[in-house]
Amino acid sequence: MDPKQTTLLCLVLCLGQRIQAQEGDFPMPFISAKSSPVIPLDGSVKIQCQAIREAYLTQLMIIKNSTYREIGRRLKFWNETDPEFVIDHMDANKAGRYQCQYRIGHYRFRYSDTLELVVTGLYGKPFLSADRGLVLMPGENISLTCSSAHIPFDRFSLAKEGELSLPQHQSGEHPANFSLGPVDLNVSGIYRCYGWYNRSPYLWSFPSNALELVVTDSIHQDYTTQNLIRMAVAGLVLVALLAILVENWHSHTALNKEASADVAEPSWSQQMCQPGLTFARTPSVCK
């Protein structure tokens, strides 16, 4: 092989190894939904793709039938925040798996983890019920049942309102039983269930009726109530003591005023008996 060709080949191989090493050094982007990934039909969701500062271009991709399709791209300058993508008018075509990818120079780097978005409202709603009262103590158990009398769903999912990830409670039974427990205070919240089919796992039914679970720590509440009672009694005692002190002060002030009046004004008989004073038609009272 010609020396020039050998040198050129070495440069190409070294450059390729350097690029691969650089790609391995950069972290993969992070994808997240700013709200719940369970989105009603025609609703919207905001997706954020976090990448390193050196990334000048971020792409959002949807995976359909093992094929990547670009949903959008954002240019980012050095000091700008991570780009956000808004998915409007959610429907069956936009539900599915999403990933982010960023670029540095002319090179593409690896994809982020997968974010799954679900659209609801495509089938009739199921019914959610409980096997006991909805107020529980920590450590107790409860079972929620999701069923549909007219639609033969393959699977059901139980979702808690406010969660920013897909429901972890899934069942292939019909009706589906979801056991919660032993519960703690974090289990409190509003729950709904959904039905869906295995062939289209990102297309869900309307949400069921809502059930609100309340986990209460009665021991802590009793302790708090007792403290409130003690504080109220102490407050009443303090008010009573203040009232007694104020009354005593008023009584003492009135007595001092009467004593001062007796000293300052001599009696009528004492005035008549002073030497050199005579009063007409005055009975003799001086002795």
UniProtKB/Swiss-Prot annotation:
Keywords: Cell membrane, Disulfide bond, Glycoprotein, IgA-binding protein, Immunoglobulin domain, Membrane, Receptor, Repeat, Secreted, Signal, Transmembrane, Transmembrane helix. GO terms for biological process: cellular response to granulocyte macrophage colony-stimulating factor stimulus; cellular response to interferon-alpha; cellular response to interleukin-6; cellular response to lipopolysaccharide; cellular response to tumor necrosis factor; cellular response to type II interferon; Fc receptor signaling pathway; immune response. The chain crosses the membrane at residues 228-246. Isoform A.1, isoform A.2 and isoform A.3 are differentially expressed between blood and mucosal myeloid cells. Isoform A.1, isoform A.2 and isoform A.3 are expressed in monocytes. Isoform A.1 and isoform A.2 are expressed in alveolar macrophages; however only one isoform is expressed at alveolar macrophages surfaces. One of its GO terms (molecular function) is IgA receptor activity. Glycans are attached at N65, N79, N141, N177, N186. Residues 22-227 are extracellular. Residues 247-287 are cytoplasmic. Residues 42-107, 139-200 form the Ig-like C2-type domain. Disulfide bonds join C49-C100, C146-C193. It comes from the Eukaryota. Binds to the Fc region of immunoglobulins alpha. Mediates several functions including cytokine production. This is Immunoglobulin alpha Fc receptor. The lineage of its organism: Eukaryota, Metazoa, Chordata, Craniata, Vertebrata. The gene is FCAR.
